[in-house]
Regions:
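Conserved beta-strand-loop-alpha-helix junction that forms the acyl-donor binding cleft
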Residues: 111-120, 143-153, 168-174, 179-180
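A short beta-loop-alpha structural element at the N-terminal edge
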Residues: 1-15, 23-27
Length: 180
C-alpha cells in the first residue's frame, strides 16, 4: 500500500533517504558519520516546511513495514524549503552552507526515491513513481540522477522520463530527467 508519510515513520524513512543521498548529507552536516546523518534526516523529517519533511513523502508499506519512500515537492517552493534545512544546519551544527538549486518553478521535483535493499527489483520503485504520476497528472515531474547510477536512470527512462540537461549538486554532476 502507498500512503502519505506521518512523523512516526521517521525511523524507517530516514535510512532510506540516506541510502539515496549519503554523499549530499555528509556535505550538508560536514561529517561522514552514518548514524549522525540518519539522525539529521529524522529530525528534519518530523518537522514541517522543509525539503525532507514527512509532508512531502510517500511510503510503500507492506505487512506494516516501510519498504520504500519517495520525497517530492513543488519546485517553485525550493527556496523556502531549502532555507529551512540550511537554518536547521546552522542551529544544529554551527556552520553556514548553501547548495545549488536542484529544481525550479515549473516542475514537481523528486528529491529522493529509495527502496530497501532486501526488496529492490520487485517493482516498489516503479509503484511509487506510478502513484506520483497519477497524483500529479498533467504536471511536469523532474529529478536528478547520479552519473554513477545507470540502474536508476534505466528505471526512470522505462517510466517515461527523458534527459533534459545537466545540473551540479553538492559539487557533482547529475542528469536532470523530466516526465511530462
Amino acid at each position: 500500500m502507498i500512503r502519505t508519510a506521518t512523523p512516526s515513520d521517521a525511523p524507517f524513512v530516514a535510512p532510506l533517504m540516506f541510502q539515496a543521498m549519503s554523499e549530499i548529507v555528509f556535505k550538508l552536516i560536514q561529517q561522514e558519520d552514518i548514524q549522525e546523518s540518519i539522525r539529521f534526516l529524522e529530525k528534519l523529517f518530523i518537522q514541517e516546511n522543509n525539503q525532507y519533511s514527512y509532508e512531502n513523502t510517500l511510503v510503500y508499506e507492506k505487512d506494516k513495514q516501510i519498504l520504500g519512500s519517495l520525497v517530492y515537492y513543488n519546485g517553485a517552493h525550493i527556496d523556502p524549503l531549502s532555507q529551512s534545512v540550511f537554518d536547521f544546519i546552522k542551529a544544529s551544527y554551527g556552520h553556514d552552507i548553501r547548495l545549488e538549486k536542484e529544481t525550479q518553478a515549473g516542475e514537481y521535483y523528486i528529491d529522493t526515491l529509495s527502496v530497501s535493499p532486501k526488496v529492490q527489483g520487485k517493482g516498489i520503485g516503479s509503484s511509487l513513481l506510478l502513484h506520483l504520476k497519477e497524483l500529479l497528472k498533467g504536471e511536469t515531474i523532474g529529478l536528478l540522477v547520479s552519473m554513477d547510477n545507470p540502474q536508476a536512470e534505466k528505471l526512470y527512462q522505462r517510466m517515461g522520463f527523458v534527459y533534459a540537461d545537466m545540473k551540479m549538486l553538492a559539487g557533482a554532476p547529475y542528469k536532470h530527467l523530466i516526465y511530462q
